[in-house]
Design a protein with these regions (language model features):
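Thiol/disulfide oxidoreductase modules built on the thioredoxin-like
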Residues: 179, 427-483
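Short active-site neighborhood of thiol/selenol oxidoreductases, capturing the structured segment around
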Residues: 345-375, 389-391
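Structural micro-motif
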Residues: 66-68, 413-416, 450-459
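Long amphipathic alpha-helical scaffold segments
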Residues: 271-280, 286-337
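A non-transmembrane, solvent-exposed segment enriched in polar/low-complexity residues
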Residues: 20-168, 175-212
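Bacterial Sec-dependent N-terminal signal peptides
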Residues: 1-25, 470, 488, 516-518
């Protein structure tokens, strides 16, 4: 008897797990192919197809993981629904107004989902109208309208909280909770009404940003909501944009995820998103975040990136190692290279200056030909008298050697000019050991040491040869060194606004690439 009851329970459980019919009726729809699309972050990907008949169509929900989905009909129209391992039965009354005509016949998630959509649509219209009115007002009327706008904001948060609390055990509840902003309390004040902690609001916002978000539930990455929340947290709307702050909270966030468990989708999505964001960031110094992510979740004993091939993982770690050499705040790798006579070897660390401009260039690079003469003008008119030196490393192998020497002479470059000359290069290729009495391997391999895959590249080093700034345009270089040396108000010889003095970022189209892999 006990065996029979146990078997009966198992059969019921098996039946309930397979009974996930996703059924839809679309009035007026011709018999055609219909697509099921699933979200991964903000993007939709095709997941299944069925043929509709008399406007009726059905997918097998047991084949698809929980998340937010879309039914795509011809004419590139679609409507969304929540899949949370329950039967779904929905009817679209008008293909030209699918949200407004939607009737949810079966599915607790989707009844609340469409109530939420209609609520937010109404609130958005109300808010937009008030904002338009606000821009046309002034004085007391403007202040009053601002209070009304804030009241609408509170109404939105109140409505969201009501829907969330009513659906805590459903996935729609999770989606709504992720959409909500942090409800900020008033900061502490003294008896005179003065705020006693100016950082209270920011700290509270950051510390409570992820409250009630199930970071071990893979379904959250199959909505655009988690992606948007993640993006906001790591933007200026969230964290202070300082590398050490970002790495601190990246680790705090990821450590809440079960990354020892392979196939953890939230961990994969989060780590990949943060890593990619800061690897490609054009904000100076943010490459430190990329290196931090590589060290903590991709490389060596910390390699938890189960989704990456060994080859791609190795490439990422090699990239991190290259960047590591030139991170802002680190000591610059020492360079000892010969001048154009090939007789005098100059050590970058023996350059006595308050600031050193480290400049990598190529005599045949178009952008370098514009930048280098400007650098000489700055050296003559500003840098020399302020104890700022330029340590210039030119491309001097092969035919570039004569071009390099010719360019130095014709343009009367009086700052330090060194390069890896052809004879030194040949000797290094044959047997570098004799050269190591004069120089170092990192000097002979300076393009790898400093990750020079395009030119020109400009760094600013302090008196201790620590990297303070990098990837600068000529206009940025002038402005920064004016500021650092107390000449903020000096007339700019090369204003940043002039496109000719634009960025030398290696990811833009100005720099000339030398064939090194990214």
């Amino acid at each position: 008897m006990r065996k029979f009851i146990l078997l009966f329970i198992i059969l019921i459980a098996a039946g309930s797990s397979s009974a996930q019919k996703l059924h839809f009726n679309v009035k007026g729809l011709s018999d055609t192919t219909i697509f099921l699309a699933k979200y991964l972050g903000p993007k939709l990907y095709y997941a299944d197809t069925v043929l509709s008949k008399n406007g009726s169509l059905e997918f097998d929900g047991s084949k698809h993981p929980r998340g937010l989905y879309a039914v795509v009909i011809p004419g590139v129209k679609y409507f969304e629904f929540v899949h949370d391992n329950e039967d779904v039965d929905m009817t679209v009354g008008d293909v030209n107004d699918m949200v407004g005509s939607m009737k949810v016949d079966k599915s607790k998630n989707n009844k609340s989902f469409y109530e939420y959509i209609l609520f937010m649509t109404e609130m958005k219209k109300k808010s937009q109208k008030m904002n338009q009115e606000y821009t046309k007002l002034s004085g007391d009327a403007k202040d009053k309208k601002l209070e009304e706008i804030r009241a609408v904001g509170k109404e939105i948060m109140s409505g969201q909280m009501e829907i969330y609390k009513a659906n805590k055990d459903l996935f729609i509840g999770t989606m709504v909770r992720m959409s909500m902003d942090v409800d900020l309390p008033e900061p502490p004040k003294d008896k005179d009404g003065n705020i006693t902690d100016s950082n209270f609001v920011y700290n509270y916002y950051i510390e409570h940003f992820w409250d009630d978000i199930p970071l071990k539930d893979d379904a959250i990455v199959r909505t655009p909501v988690y992606h948007n929340k993640l993006d906001k947290f790591f933007s200026q709307q969230g964290l202070i944009q300082i590398p050490d702050t970002i790495t601190k909270y990246a680790k705090k966030l990821v450590d809440q995820m079960d990354y020892g468990n392979e196939d953890n989708q939230v961990f994969q999505y989060t780590v990949h998103h943060i890593t990619q964001k800061y690897e490609s960031s054009k904000i100076m110094g943010m490459d430190r975040v990329f290196v931090f992510m590589a060290d903590n979740w991709y490389c060596g004993d910390n390699n938890h990136a189960w989704w990456m091939s060994e080859e791609n993982s190795t490439k990422l770690c090699e990239r991190a190692d290259k960047i590591r050499n030139t991170m802002i705040g680190e000591y610059s790798p020492m360079l000892i290279l010969p001048d154009s006579t090939e007789e005098k070897w100059i050590n970058s660390y023996k350059v006595e200056a308050d600031y050193t401009v480290l400049y990598f260039w190529d005599p045949n690079c178009g952008h370098c030909k514009k930048t280098t003469p400007k650098l000489q003008v700055l050296y003559d008119k500003k840098f020399k008298e302020r104890n700022i030196e330029i340590f210039s490393v030119g491309k001097a192998t092969g035919s570039d050697f004569e071009d390099w020497k010719k360019y130095i002479k014709e343009n009367e470059l009086t700052f330090i000019n060194v390069g890896l000359t052809q004879s030194v290069y040949n000797q290094a290729m044959e047997d570098p050991r004799p050269l190591l009495q004069k120089t170092t391997l990192q000097s002979l391999n300076y393009t790898d040491t400093y990750d020079i895959y395009s030119t020109p590249r400009i760094f600013i080093l302090d008196k201790d040869k620590k990297i303070k700034f990098k990837q600068l345009s000529i206009g940025q270089l002038e402005e920064i060194l004016d500021d650092l040396t107390g000449h903020h108000d000096d007339v700019k010889l090369y204003p940043k606004e002039d496109p000719e003095n634009g960025a030398t970022d290696p990811d833009d189209d100005h720099g000339d690439h030398d064939g090194h892999d990214h």
